[in-house]
Amino acid sequence: GIMDTLKNLAKTAGKGALQSLLKMASCKLSGQC
């Protein structure tokens, strides 16, 4: 249903945000930003 779709969208968005945060953190730690 719609709720399942929204939950999946939230999961996907959360994963994307986490990945970009991890990328930023790792590039700052390695000094390659």
UniProtKB/Swiss-Prot annotation:
It is found in: Secreted. Expressed by the skin glands. Signal peptide: none annotated. Keywords: Antimicrobial, Disulfide bond, Secreted. One of its GO terms (biological process) is defense response. Antimicrobial peptide. This is Brevinin-2Rh. The lineage of its organism: Eukaryota, Metazoa, Chordata, Craniata, Vertebrata.
